[in-house]
């Protein structure tokens, strides 16, 4: 568990704190996932929040003074969506509420955008952070900062009942030239399909999660890919479709890719990210988040996997 790893890393962080000060303060101008950002991330993840007791500044101070924040979501159940009353809920917004409350920010509002517009919307200042269960990877970490993960989960396909084409993973799509698969634009599944060699004419890209499943219902696509939990949520809400078994996609070297989600921040808001991360880690180590996350259908092991990892582990 990361709780043990955290204690070990805290010892290193204290010993190296003077050497890391300049690195941590200057590591965000280019947004790159380089050694500077990794060092800053490790310091923020593992120093237990001991930043000398100084007052917050920048965006964090503004949010604390206002007591409210706007987060970006993509209306994807169960990760981040609006309920029937128009209130933001889901795994990520509810975890964010709990963590932000510990930072003195009690009101969480949401802006709904297409998944592929989350990063650009954050960068443009449309909202203050991303709380959409976004997977952490090196490509995205070149554009924004991430927290440590709060869940890790596999992939699955939604297919018509009986799975008439026998689809089970991306390689099975390659092996079935007549199959067309729906993928959420900007999601990691685009990359998974590319690595597997799925031809572009077998892929339909969508900006909206529900539209993918509407087209599956109508027979316009043969499968929808997504996290196993997204697929299961949709399958349980619709007639005539089923989920394949969960699987982990493969990278260029044939190694399984572990999909882990976290929270996104602008590159110039490292102080905010660091404070959020410290509070997140504390609540993970204390077991305060597991009921929130499993309440949205995640398994306990999905939460426990994430506790063993940091953002640096996922971005290289």
Report residues per predicted region.
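C-terminal motif of bacterial Sec signal peptides marking the signal peptidase cleavage site
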Residues: 20-24
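A ligand-binding cleft/hinge motif common to bilobed small-molecule-binding domains
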Residues: 134-142, 192-195, 222-257
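Extracytoplasmic small-molecule ligand-binding "clamshell" domains
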Residues: 54-132
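Acidic, polar ligand-binding/catalytic clefts
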Residues: 97, 108-172
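Periplasmic-binding protein-like
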Residues: 152-156, 237-277, 300-316
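Bilobed "Venus flytrap"/periplasmic-binding protein-like clamshell domains
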Residues: 70-78, 88-103, 155-213, 223, ...
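Short, low-complexity, disordered segments immediately C-terminal to signal peptides
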Residues: 26-58
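Extended ligand-binding regions for polar small-molecule ligands
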Residues: 26, 93-102, 163, 187, ...
């Amino acid at each position: 568990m990361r709780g043990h790893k955290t204690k070990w890393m805290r010892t290193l962080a204290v010993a190296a704190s003077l050497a890391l000060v300049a690195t941590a303060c200057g590591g965000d101008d280019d947004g790159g996932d380089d050694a500077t950002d990794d060092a800053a991330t490790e310091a923020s993840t593992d120093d237990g929040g001991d930043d000398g007791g100084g007052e917050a500044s920048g965006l964090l101070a503004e949010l604390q003074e206002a007591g409210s924040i706007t987060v970006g979501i993509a209306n994807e159940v169960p990760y981040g969506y609006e309920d029937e009353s128009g209130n933001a809920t889901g795994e990520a917004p509810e975890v964010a509420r709990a963590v932000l409350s510990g930072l003195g920010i009690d009101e969480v509002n949401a802006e709904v955008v297409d998944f592929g517009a989350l990063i650009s919307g954050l960068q443009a200042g449309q909202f203050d952070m991303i709380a959409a269960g976004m997977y952490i990877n090196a490509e995205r970490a070149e554009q924004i900062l991430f927290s440590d993960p709060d869940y890790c989960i596999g992939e699955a396909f939604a297919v018509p009942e009986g799975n008439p084409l026998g689809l089970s993973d991306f390689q099975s799509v390659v092996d079935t030239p007549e199959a067309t698969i729906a993928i959420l634009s900007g999601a990691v599944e685009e990359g998974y399909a590319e690595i597997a060699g799925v031809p572009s004419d077998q892929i339909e890209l969508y900006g909206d999660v529900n539209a993918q499943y509407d087209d599956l219902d109508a027979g316009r696509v043969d499968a929808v890919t997504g996290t196993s939990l997204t697929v299961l949520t949709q399958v349980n809400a619709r007639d005539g479709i089923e989920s394949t078994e969960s699987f982990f996609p493969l990278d260029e070297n044939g190694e399984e890719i572990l999909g882990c989600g976290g929270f996104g921040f602008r590159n110039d808001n490292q102080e905010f990210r660091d404070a959020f991360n410290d509070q997140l880690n504390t609540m993970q180590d204390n077991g305060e988040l597991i009921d929130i996350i499993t309440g949205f259908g995640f398994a306990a092991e999905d939460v426990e996997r994430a506790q063993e990892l940091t953002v640096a582990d996922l971005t290289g």
